[in-house]
Amino acid sequence: VNAIPSAPTVDPSNTTQYCLGATASSMSAVSISGYTLKWYDNADNLLATGSTGPVPSTVASGSTTYKVTQTNGTTLCESSALLVTVTVNALPSISVVGGASQTVCDGSSITLNGDGGVSYSWSGVDASGNAISNGASFVPPGSTTTTYTVTGTDGNGCSNTSSINVISTALPTINAGSDVEICAGETVTLSGSGAGSGGSYSWSGGISDGVSFTPTVTTTYTLTGTDANGCTGTDQVTVTVNAIPSAPTVDPSNTTQY
């Protein structure tokens, strides 16, 4: 009666994990000298013989169980099987908080955050050419669209990516009009331009765009124009109020007889 050999040992362990789509290595085991290793699938189909086992597939996520035995080269007695589990982990679903596109005004800062992982790294640079990082405010290059890509890694060490287009738009060129001179008591109407369709205007001094008013003293008014993207620009106009001169006097008087 020949003894049944002990099960082989697997290097590095009998549990191996990969990320979906990763390049897998062939399984390996250590046998007793003079013994032959045999590799089986979970249905006991022979896959390979020798110290180098099959290469696990990583095309689908999930766990697969393999079996490995060792056979005495003399007695041909085969050991019990050592179970080897290979787990293929799905890639994390990584996204950018706020969506795939965001618009900012030239010179304004933005903060980008990844979602779906436990750690993140970003590609792309700010307006000064410095690398950006997750959750850190930065100013993107002006008047252009820049694509930033985040790589998110989950707790299994598996990574995936997502991208966002950051559109930096030029500030509107706001025009408050030419300086105005009026006489005291006269009305004036100030109207701004440059904010474009869907834009709006606000004036200092409590006046309204396009609405006449009667200033009492010379004043410089500041116009703030906001375009459809929420970007703002300013301009100023001075309204000079000239005093009304007094009536002339008549010499010798304003009543004359002939």
Kindly give the residue locations of the regions a language model identified.
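Short, exposed coil/turn segments at beta-strand boundaries within extracellular/luminal domains
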Residues: 19, 74-81, 105, 155-161, ...
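Interdomain boundary/hinge segments at the C-termini of tandem beta-sandwich modules
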Residues: 1-5, 85-90, 164-170, 237-243
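Proline-enriched interdomain boundary motifs that mark the N-terminal boundary
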Residues: 4-13, 91-99, 171-177, 244-252
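Solvent-exposed segments in extracellular or luminal domains encompassing
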Residues: 49-66, 132-149, 209-222
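Short beta-strand segments of immunoglobulin-like
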Residues: 13-18, 99-104, 177-182, 253-258
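A short beta-strand segment in extracellular, disulfide-stabilized domains
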Residues: 21-31, 106-116, 186-195, 257
